[in-house]
Amino acid sequence: MTDIKTKTPTIRLFHVRKRYGAKAALLDVTLDIFKNEFLFIHGPSGAGKTTLLKLLYLGEHVSEGQILIDGMNLARISAKRVHMLRRKFGIIFQDFKLIPTKTVFENVALVLEAAGKPNRAIQKKVRSVLRAVGMEEKANSFPPTLSGGEQQRVAIARAVAGDPKIILADEPTGSLDPDSAASIMELLKGFHTRGATVLLATHNKELASNMASRTIYLNQGTLEITHPS
């Protein structure tokens, strides 16, 4: 496990609350997340795990409290700097969010095209990340023809194509068989070993128990347990 006692927090949450109308999704969450940490966010469905991840990349905005990322206060960030912030993140969505009418290669390339990368660099990078996740031979396939595990591999390739500092993974193994889930975890551990900070939201307690990593437990929007503390 990352020795957090010697680290400076890269993400800081101070008394964060999030409400949707009268419903509270997060209640007074205070948390430090450290550079190159692999953090599990564990809790049942509806606990606030996805909401917490969305707040970090400004997919949602806090109702109260503050979030700082590398010292940047998200409440004060200008519209021009939102894109800069989001480039820090690679996001693995629970439902993959692959475009069915685009090939595997094209789905991964979209991230780099949006960042304005030159075509030659895009070609090289996409081939590299597809090779890293074992999907190079499926580059010209379309998502509907792939298995769930294969689609998740493509989603991971897309998430890491921009060399993000932070990977947010929302239930990345939730719909996969045990063998596919294990291979996805190995991929994420590999990117963590190469320097990425990984935040993984899951309802599966076994995932967290199989790694010597810090786990926080969310229940009904409340941070109840951090282990180890």
Pin down the residues of each PLM region.
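Conserved ABC ATPase signature
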Residues: 142-146, 150
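Short coil-to-helix segment of the ABC ATPase nucleotide-binding domain corresponding to the Q-loop/switch region
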Residues: 102-109
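Helix-to-loop junction immediately C-terminal to a conserved catalytic motif
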Residues: 57
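Catalytic Walker B motif of ABC-type/P-loop ATPase nucleotide-binding domains
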Residues: 167-170
